[in-house]
Every structure is written in structure tokens, then in C-alpha cells.
Amino acid sequence: MQAKLIERLMTYAKIDTQSDFTSTTTPSTAKQWDLIRHLEKELKELGLTDVETDEYGYLFATLPSNVDYDVPTIGFLAHVDTATDFTGTNVSPQLVEHYEGGDIVLNESLNVVLSPKDFPELDGYVGHTLMTTDGTTLLGADDKAGIAEIVTAIEYLLAHPEIPHGPVRIAFTPDEEIGRGPHKFDVARFNADFAYTMDGGPLGELQYESFNAAGATVTFHGTNVHPGSAKNKMVNSMKLAMAFQNRLPADEAPERTSNYEGFFHLNGFNGDVEKTTLQYIIRDHDKQKFEARKALMEKLVLEWKQKYGEERIELQMEDQYYNMAEKIEPVKHIVDTVADVMRGLGIEPKIEPIRGGTDGSQLSYMGLPTPNIFTGGENYHGKFEYVSVNNMEKATTVIIETLRTFAKRAQA
């Protein structure tokens, strides 16, 4: 199984599929189609039914039930796009077999080293086979490891018809990394009772709580005048923006928060004297605190208007997704079952809140409860990204055993 996982992830990772938040199309980038078409062909060759890709790049397929009694239809999803934070062009995955510990030189000429000194969790992977980057790109295990695990699990079930399972629906989706993964997802057409995203991180992650999320763009308008004659005339939009940022709570930022603590994250700053734009993401697990964060943003904008003039500042803010716990709690057995499966495989479930979101965050509010399962990866979205092939195999086994367990329970 490991050989198949390596082969698939190597192939998928080399296909550039970065999304683009500035685009208005779905998928946001044409290159996502390259992997979508590859997967469509692969699923057809495996012998799945109902293999269809719609005009927006959502690829659906079915593994029919192999039992003669009713079992819930279960979905498994992963996203084809990779993050925009770091380049995903010309990905060249490296394989470290039977990692012996210590530093991993990703790129000697650029002196890029993956070291336990910087990433102490590496010490827990001694003896594992790791797939890393070459130090110049991200790897894309988020979420191509999830794709590889789903396809490999389905291939295994097809080769082992003695393993009982109900109907399985598969979906590979675009644009998750820019928050639009489910925007054009047809839940009725997918037709599953519930689903799981294979989009988590280290071994054992099992998540059904996510952030409430909003995005905000604050635009400041200045007045540019030659510096030599600027007294009492120039208004520097960058200084207006800096003062605005400094009014937000300094300790409520990603680098100073953890667990259930929310934050304001300034993730874009672009400007000159005449015009400056700040891009924020706003996050909190608690709905009331989330609303309070948005209210603070609106309050500060109002203050700036009163102090500097209506024309000096604009705010665009919109909700992106909500904490899926509210929709999953009523069907919590879909989480508990996977936790039981993990324990049966000797994996300790790590049921923790996601400090982020998955496609499941939105899908759960669209009527498809969708918790999130680990894939085995670490350090997503950068050149130090890597994945344990051993833990990819365990994630694949979790898929297989989850389907077996639901089939057995339906028979009881």
C-alpha cells in the first residue's frame, strides 16, 4: 500500500494546482483542471461508477455497496488546489526512506535544512518514510495526500470484496485554500448521508469544530503632495493604515493565540501615500466573540471616518464560514465511530478544534455534516512541508475500517 501512496502523491504533487483568490472563476485557476482530469481518468480506470465532473471542476464518483442491506451513503472528500502562501510550481518531491533522525538537507545549494531543532516533532518520525520538498516549493500534501489516501482506499476495497461496505461517494473539489471549496458544490447531487474530508494534519487528528471566519478589506485614501510643499496638505494613507492596525489588540494575533483563542490576522498590506489596502482574516470558535470582533472592526472604521473624514476609509467585510460543531453535534456518532476505529487500530484520536477551516465547515451548513480526518502531513503551506508515508497508510486504513464498521453496525 505504501508504494501506491508514494506513487500517487509523487504524481499529484508535480501537477501545479495553486488557486488564486483574485480570480472570479471556478476553479479559480485553469491549471486545477490538469489534476481534475487526471483523477477523472484514474477513477474510471479503477472501475468506479457515476464518474462525472461538472463545469466548475467538482469531480464526483461512486463505489457501489457490496452488501444486500441498507447502509448509510458515506462521502469522502479532498481538495485539488494548493495554498497561495508559497510557490507550487515545479514541485520536486524528495523521499527519505527510514528516517534516522537529525537534519534533513532539502537543498544543499540554498542551505535549506529541515531540522528537529526548528521542528521538534520530527523526532517522532524516526523509522518512517517521509516525503519532503526540495526546499524551493511547497509539497502540496495539503491536500494531495488526502486524495492519494482516498483513491488508494477505494482501490483496496475493489481488490478485497470480502470487506463489507455501503455506498461510497467521492468528491475532489477546487479552491478550498481560498475559502470557496463548497461554493458551487451540489450537495443534492452528491447525495451522501454524511461525509469526511481527508484534510487534517498529523496522526490521529479528528476534527469537528472549526473557526467562525470572516474576511475584511480596509482601504485608506490619502492625498499626495510633493514633500517639499506638503505641510498641512499631505495625508499619508499608509500612516492612517498603520495607526488603524495598532488599534487592534496586539495579543489577539495568530502568533500569540492557540486552542480556542480567536484573532485578527493582517495578511496583506499594500500601499503608498495616495492609497493603502489592509487585508484581514477574522477568526473565533465562539459565535458571540466572532460577532464582537467584526463589531470592533466596524467601530474602528467609524472612528476613522469621524476623525479623518468619510472619504478617507472604506470597509468591505463578509463572512466566509462558520463553526461546523453546531451542525455535527446532532450527529456526533459520525465522529465517535471514527474515534472508535482509530483506537481499534492503535491510534489515539486527537479531537481538537481546527484553527482554520475545511470544506466541511461550509458543507455542514449546506446539509452535509462533514468532520475532518488526519492525512499525516506537517508544516503545510511552505518549503518545510512533509508527510509521513507510514501515517498516510494509517489514514487509508482508517477510511477502509470506517466503511467496514458502518456496514457491520447497519447489519446488527
UniProtKB/Swiss-Prot annotation:
Gene3D superfamilies, alphabetized: 3.30.70.360, Zn peptidases
GO biological process: peptide catabolic process; proteolysis
The protein's Enzyme Commission number: 3.4.11.4
Subcellular location: Cytoplasm
Co-factor remark: Binds 2 Zn(2+) ions per subunit.
InterPro entries listed in its UniProt record: ArgE/DapE_CS, Bact_exopeptidase_dim_dom, Peptidase_M20, Peptidase_M20_dimer, Peptidase_M20B
Keywords for this protein: Aminopeptidase, Cytoplasm, Hydrolase, Metal-binding, Metalloprotease, Protease, Zinc
Enzyme kind, highest EC tier: hydrolase
Active-site residues, record numbering mapped to chain: D81, E176 (proton acceptor)
GO CC, alphabetical: cytosol
Gene Ontology MF terms: metallopeptidase activity; tripeptide aminopeptidase activity; zinc ion binding
The UniProt record lists the keyword Ion transport: no
Transmembrane segments: none
Residues that hold Zn(2+) 1 according to the record: H79, D142, D199
Homology family: Belongs to the peptidase M20B family.
Primary role: Cleaves the N-terminal amino acid of tripeptides.
Name recorded for this polypeptide: Peptidase T
Organism: Exiguobacterium sp. (strain ATCC BAA-1283 / AT1b)
